[in-house]
């Protein structure tokens, strides 16, 4: 692998507010070019084994949304560790309570339907910056905790159905879904769900099959397999944009101190908005 991706790339802390409609910075590719994505009207799926760097990417995404006053944060983290650092500025924070998770998804579905009623009345196709609606970013880490571990079978299935609905219908209503899993298996991320994500990012996986479950069938045989990423290369993964080919990149790293500073910065921005 090329040397530029092996060197750690600490991320700086922004000094001004952003917008969720602007591209967000994720890191650099093998040619040291900036990698940015536009998540408004899109969703992203992140997958990889424990310690592969999903949380590195996740924090970059949440950081951009946090300092965007035009975006609300709804965070779900069964372990309450990774996303817990951001909970002070989240409109909704769900820990290890499946009932709370289901009620939050119900509320978000109701908000989505209300926005579609507004759009139908206004004869419009999607929410824009001119509307009185802020974007909402729903971040779920880890999907398998809520869809395959906690609660009973009926609750887990209900969670999976509601999440799929938000991924499928939320984009035009200004609802962005960011989902992460360390269990990239077909029962956790079925093809019907994976294909709804406009962006997919695969970090180190144990097998080609696991890599393809995130990126899509056939990419491993085409030479884009996350199981070839070295275990020590945390934060390196393949990013696939809708209609493109996977791009090998390294995510910028935010320390805990960066995150604490960003939370305070975001608090000031949101207070002034």
Predicted regions: what is each one?
Residues 1:
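Acidic-aromatic/histidine active-site loop/patch
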Residues 4-122, 136-223, 227-229, 252-260, ...:
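P-loop NTPase catalytic phosphate-binding loop
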Residues 24-26, 235-241:
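Short polybasic amphipathic segments
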Residues 32, 242-244:
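Glycine-centered tight beta-turn/hairpin loop motif at sheet-sheet or coil-to-beta transitions
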Residues 126-128, 225-229, 239:
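Short proline/glycine-enriched turn/loop segments at secondary-structure junctions
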Residues 127-136:
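Short basic/glycine-enriched coil/helix segment immediately N-terminal to the Walker B
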């Amino acid at each position: 692998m090329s040397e530029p991706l092996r060197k750690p790339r600490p991320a700086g802390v922004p000094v001004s507010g952003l917008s969720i409609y602007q591209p967000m910075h994720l890191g650099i590719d093998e040619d040291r070019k900036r990698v940015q994505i536009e998540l408004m009207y899109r969703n992203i799926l992140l997958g990889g084994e424990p310690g592969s760097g999903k949380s590195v990417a996740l924090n970059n995404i949440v950081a951009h949304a946090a300092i965007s006053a035009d975006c609300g944060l709804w965070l779900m983290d069964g372990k309450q560790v990774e996303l817990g650092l951001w909970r002070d500025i989240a409109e909704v924070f769900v820990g290890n309570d499946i009932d709370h998770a289901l009620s939050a998804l119900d509320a978000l579905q109701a908000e989505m339907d209300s926005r579609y009623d507004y759009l139908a009345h206004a004869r419009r196709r999607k929410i824009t910056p001119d509307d009185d609606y802020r974007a909402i970013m729903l971040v779920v880490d880890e999907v398998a905790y809520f869809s395959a571990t906690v609660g009973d079978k009926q609750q887990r299935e209900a969670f999976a159905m509601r999440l799929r609905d938000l991924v499928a219908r939320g984009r035009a209503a200004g609802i962005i879904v960011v989902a992460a899993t360390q269990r990239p298996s077909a029962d956790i991320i079925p093809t019907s769900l994976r294909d709804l994500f406009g962006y997919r990012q695969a970090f180190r996986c144990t097998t080609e099959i696991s890599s393809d479950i995130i990126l899509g069938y056939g990419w491993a045989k085409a030479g884009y397999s996350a199981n070839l990423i070295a275990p020590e290369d945390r934060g390196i993964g393949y990013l696939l944009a809708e209609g493109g080919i996977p791009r090998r990149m390294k995510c910028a790293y935010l320390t805990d101190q960066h995150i604490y500073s960003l939370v305070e910065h975001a608090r000031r921005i949101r207070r002034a908005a």
